[in-house]
Structures are given as structure tokens and as C-alpha cells.
Amino acid sequence: MCEGPSRISGPIPPDPTLCPDYYRRPASAQGRLEGNALKLDLLTSGRDLDSSPPRGPRIRPEAREILERGQRGVGDVLLQLGCISLGSGVSPKRKNPKDHEKENLRRIKEIQRRFQDQERSREQGQPKPLKALWRSPKYDNVESRVKARMKELGPTSVTEPAHFLRAHSRCGPGLPPSRASSPQLALPGPQAKGPGLGVDFISRNALAAKRAPRRHSRSLQVLAQVQEQQRQAQERYNATQKGHVPHYLLERRDLWRKEAEARQRSQPDPSMPPGHTLMPENQRLETLNNLLQSQSQLLRELVLLPAGADSLRAQGHRAELDRKLVQIEEAIKIFSRPKVFVKMDT
């Protein structure tokens, strides 16, 4: 027999079938936050569902913040204190960055619009009256000399042609006329009505413009002088240097030739036999000249011998002359060569 729920607390839970109304299965904290606290429990009965809906759990306002803090950890909270956020949400204290480019464009457009309005108002406005020039009061009662002269001359006839130059007609170079070429002006006679009357200034100006010497600017004169100097320098170069070998190249070529000859002389002749030396050229020519003189002398002696002499002495003398002539001829052949090698004394 059961008198109600047991008030004894121990490690062994009581049997829930005894008092099902008191031993309900509690919902989790996450389920209560998500709104699942009203789900059907296995131990609930149909009578309880039909009678009245169960009362919702009591949840504090900061429960969701505590749950999110537990899921993210404490590091995110510490970083949020330093204005650094690791989560997907944006900190409410941080403001959106200002777009300076759009702000500058907006200000530029405002300035342009303001200037356009000023230009439009200036164009539509009436012209401002000009300020009168200052005039000294001492000339108030003075009559104009031009007006007095016009009264003296009288009204000009309509049929009389006006002597003046039209636009772009007889335009000269604009240079002042030379004093030497300008014609002498005649003095006005007693019948002249006014100064300058009776002088044809148009003809005088045209004549002075034709006779005026043509003057060049300073830059053109300097340019002409420089071009003349360049032309003279080019002509001088063509006459003295163009097509000619420079002197330093000629000197260098002679030096190279002398060095080549010296190297050739210093090198041993490959045709020279061992133990011999080359006879100098002057000594060779001197020896050849002596041999030619000896040959001519022996030929003269051979010719002067008597033809009918058959003695042994005459025959021996003739044989000696022939032998010497043969030796001299052989020596002449040797010393007539360009190179003569002499055996060195050991």
C-alpha cells in the first residue's frame, strides 16, 4: 500500500511506477532552450495532456548567453574585450567602416553643382554698369581742340573719297622706314589750311616699305654664320684628310715592318747546315769582286802565252793557269748566290 511519494533520499531511485505523476522525466537544459519541454514523456498519461498544458521551464534571460559562452570557450570572450572577434557575429560596439571614396565623390558633385548654379546665375543676370572714370574738375569748362578743328574745316563732302587703308590691303613687313631712304617732306605753304594737308601718306608709306632693307633676326644671322663655319670645316677636311691615311698609321706601319725584318734576321736560317754561319752581304760582294778581277787577270796571262811554245815549262804554266781559272769559276758560282754559308772555326 502506497501513501505517496517517498521522502527518503538515497543512491537508489524509487520506482517511478508507484507515483507516475510525481516522477516525470526532466527535460534537458538545451531542450528547454529550444522549446522542446512540452514533448510527450514516456511516463505521462493521457489524462495529464488533456487536462492542462504543463508549465514552461523557468529560464533566466542570460541563459542563452551562458550556453553560447560555454560552447565557444573563454578565449573568445577575452578577445572580445580587446576588440577582436573570432565568431561569426559582429560585435555591437564596433561601428561600420566609413567609405571615404563615396564621401569624396559626393562632395565633388556638390561642389560642381554649386559652381554650375553660379555660372548659370551669372549668365542670366544683367551686365553690371561700368564705373565712370575719374576726371579732374579743372577741365570741365575747357573745349576740345578736335571739336574746334572740325568746326573750322566744315562738313566733309559725301562724294569726296576718304583716304584711308582698308583692312589687309598693302600690308608691309611692319618695319620702320629707314631715315636715309625716306623722302624729304616739303614745308607747308602759306595757302595750306592745316598741317599735314596735301601730303599723300599712302604713297609715301608704300614707297618706304619697298625701299626698306630686309632685316633678319639675330638668331637667323647666328644660324647662317654657324652653317658657313661648318661648310668651311667640311671643305677643309675633304681637301686635307678625307681619303688620306693618317700619319700615325704610316709611322706605325713602318715600325711594324722594321720589327718584322729584325725578327726575321734574328731567326736562324733553316737551310743553313750545322756548324756554318751566314756571310755578311758586303763581305760576299767584296769577295765576288776580287774573284772577278783575278779571273780577268788570269785570262790576260793565258792569252799572252806564245802559241808555238811546246816546251815542258810552257805546257806546265798553261796547265796551272787553266786549273786556277777552273777554281775561280767555281768560287764565282758560289759567291754569286744570295746566301753564302761559311764554316765556323772550331
Swiss-Prot record:
Residues 98-107, 113-125 have a biased composition (Basic and acidic residues). Residues 251-343 form the Enkurin domain. Pfam families: Enkurin. It is found in: Cytoplasm, Cytoskeleton, Microtubule organizing center, Centrosome; Cytoplasm, Cytoskeleton, Microtubule organizing center, Centrosome, Centriole; Cytoplasm, Cytoskeleton, Cilium basal body; Cell projection, Cilium. Residues 1-24, 88-107, 113-132, 259-280 are annotated as: Disordered. One of its GO terms (biological process) is motile cilium assembly. PROSITE patterns: ENKURIN. The modification Phosphoserine is found at residues 91, 136. Widely expressed with highest levels in testis and lung. Keywords: Cell projection, Cilium biogenesis/degradation, Cytoplasm, Cytoskeleton, Microtubule, Phosphoprotein. One of its GO terms (cellular component) is 9+0 non-motile cilium. GO terms for molecular function: alpha-tubulin binding; microtubule binding. Disruption phenotype: Severely impaired epidermal barrier function with a significant reduction in the thickness of the granular and spinous layers of the epidermis. Misoriented division of basal keratinocytes and significantly reduced proliferation rate of basal keratinocytes and suprabasal cells. Ciliogenesis defects in multiple organs. Retinal photoreceptor cilia numbers are greatly decreased, leading to defective vision, and there is also a decreased number of renal primary cilia as well as a reduced percentage of ciliated cells in the tracheal epithelium. Impaired cardiac function. Coiled coil: none annotated. Microtubule-binding protein which regulates microtubule organization and stability. Promotes the stability of astral microtubules and facilitates the proper orientation of the mitotic spindle. This allows the oriented division of basal keratinocytes and contributes to epidermal stratification. Required for the assembly of both primary and motile cilia. Destabilizes the interaction between CCP110 and CEP97 by competing with CEP97 for binding to CCP110 which promotes the removal of CCP110 and CEP97 from the mother centriole and allows the initiation of ciliogenesis. Interacts with alpha-tubulin. Interacts (via central region) with CCP110 (via N-terminal region); competes with CEP97 for binding to CCP110. This is Enkurin domain-containing protein 1. It comes from Mus musculus (Mouse). The lineage of its organism: Eukaryota, Metazoa, Chordata, Craniata, Vertebrata.
